A protein has these predicted regions:
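Core mixed alpha/beta domains of very large multi-subunit molecular machines
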Residues: 1-76, 84-92
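Conserved catalytic alpha/beta cores of large enzymes that bind or transform nucleotide phosphates
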Residues: 67-68, 73, 83-85, 93-190
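Conserved small/polar residues in nucleotide/adenosyl-binding loops
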Residues: 197-198
Length: 199
């Protein structure tokens, strides 16, 4: 019952503003700034009044946090208005190309156990390989997003890369077809654009 502009965070005073940062993130469009509302009855009931390591947010805020899905995701809460004026957090509206995107809905397959007793994963009638090296793949896509941001990629191009990163980060855990995401989002072309720009 929290709005898209509110956060339940018992460790912070009501009315203060918090930047919510989840790592890795694709850019400032994945950093919502929310106002603390510690009077929300549903949040008090669910989290309690004394929690130091849990906050409550709206599902739309979670979507914006680089695909947080309420399965134990970690978010840093950074107050945005300190008296010394040292903390300045940039935020911008979410990318249109990310609205409503759900990696599990788009890339989760169906498990079948073969005659050999091993699990096989299928999507659209085709078997696909599961991800085994999340850190490596996440490093690749994070570096690409950083490079794209530096060279001034369009919002559409950034959305393609970030959608793929959302699939990659959950691919191993939720058995997602990350290779198909790589094709659908034409990640190879994005890599080529970065190479051409830096050459």
């Amino acid at each position: 019952s929290l709005s898209e502009k509110e956060v339940y965070a018992p460790g912070y005073p009501d009315g203060s503003k918090l930047a919510l940062v989840r790592y890795p993130h694709g850019g400032t469009f994945e950093i919502p700034i929310c106002t603390v509302n510690n009077k929300n009855k549903d949040a008090i009931k669910m989290i309690g009044k004394d929690s130091i390591d849990a906050i409550g947010i709206n599902s739309k805020v979670a979507e914006r946090l680089s695909g947080a899905d309420f399965d134990g995701d970690t978010v840093m809460c950074i107050p945005t208005h300190d008296r010394a004026g040292k903390v300045k957090i940039a935020s911008r509206p979410p990318l249109e190309g990310l609205e409503g995107f759900d990696p599990k809905m788009n890339y989760q397959g169906e498990k079948k156990t073969g005659s050999d007793g091993k699990e096989h994963w299928y999507r659209d009638g085709r078997e696909y390989q599961l991800m085994k090296k999340t850190d490596t793949e996440m490093g690749k896509i994070s570096n690409l997003i950083t490079d794209m941001t530096i060279i001034g990629a369009t919002d559409d191009e950034l959305a393609r890369a970030v959608r793929h990163s959302m699939v990659v980060i959950d691919a191993e855990k939720h058995h997602l077809d990350y290779k198909q995401s790589e094709k659908d989002n034409n990640i190879q072309a994005l890599k080529q654009n970065c190479l051409l720009y830096t050459s």
